[in-house]
């Protein structure tokens, strides 16, 4: 990362965008891979992919971790007790990661309204047996 006068940049890309990873994932997926590889190379024992808004992003992150044999967890942000921010059902996300991801140590939900958590946990449990983690927000509304 390079410190710029009023914002951070990674690989020359401004982090001022609220969803910089999603934007860069679509435009420059190799940059996302390199950023996460650097975290592993720095010596992290486990990487926490948090507030993941899309299944596509989660798959890229999982691919990186699995390629290098690093343990990780993926935590989705959700719009309701059924869907992640992208509009895909959490059940589909859980099914996607149910098998074939040996280094995935937890699938979860964060930055999500507390009233949605119980339903999300049930849907994840119905579709995979990976340990579940949650840490809801305090209920505030964000842009």
What are these regions (language model features)?
Residues 1-143:
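Domain-level signal for soluble alpha/beta catalytic cores
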């Amino acid at each position: 990362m390079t410190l710029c006068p009023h914002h951070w940049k990674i690989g020359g890309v401004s982090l001022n965008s609220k969803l910089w990873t999603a934007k860069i994932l679509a435009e420059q997926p190799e940059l996302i891979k390199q950023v996460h590889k650097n975290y592993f190379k720095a010596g992290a024992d486990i990487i926490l992919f948090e507030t993941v808004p899309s299944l596509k992003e989660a798959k890229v992150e999982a691919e990186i971790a699995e390629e290098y044999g690093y343990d990780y967890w993926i935590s989705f942000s959700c719009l309701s007790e059924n869907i992640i921010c992208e509009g895909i059902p959490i059940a589909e996300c859980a099914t996607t990661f149910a098998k074939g991801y040996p280094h995935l140590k937890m699938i979860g939900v964060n930055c999500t309204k507390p009233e949605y958590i119980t339903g999300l946990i049930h849907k994840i449990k119905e579709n995979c047996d990976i340990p579940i983690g949650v840490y809801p927000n305090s209920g505030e509304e964000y842009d």
